[in-house]
Amino acid sequence: MDKFYNYNSSSHQALLSFKVKPNSKQNLISNFVIINNIQYLKLSIKAIPEQGKANSEIINYLAKEWKLSRSNIEIIKGHTHSLKTILIKNINEDYLNLIINSYIK
């Protein structure tokens, strides 16, 4: 099974896989889901998936939740799909592990 993130220590970047549920009651990251033998973090977002509103809210939410700059968060795959790959730039591996471990239950 593929894990939901990959970290590149030379560039201090991480790729994370998310399963996004737009139009939710609250913004929330909750545990994992496995699809086609790939792990995804489950992410609920209040915004509707129209005109990039949900994608924008994803970036805003992750930046606030993880105390990162919005400019260091980029959706690189899945702009119009619920399965998204998100690039996190300028992140320390220890800090990334701290974030990830907070969602492992």
UniProtKB/Swiss-Prot annotation:
Superkingdom of source: Bacteria
GO CC, alphabetical? cytoplasm
InterPro entries linked: DUF167 (IPR003746), YggU-like_sf (IPR036591)
UniProt xrefs under Gene3D superfamilies: YggU-like (3.30.1200.10)
- Xref: HAMAP family: UPF0235 (MF_00634)
Q: Which family does it belong to?
A: Belongs to the UPF0235 family.
Q: What is this protein called?
A: UPF0235 protein A1G_07140
Which organism does this record belong to? Rickettsia rickettsii (strain Sheila Smith)
- Give the organism's phylogenetic lineage: Bacteria, Pseudomonadati, Pseudomonadota, Alphaproteobacteria, Rickettsiales
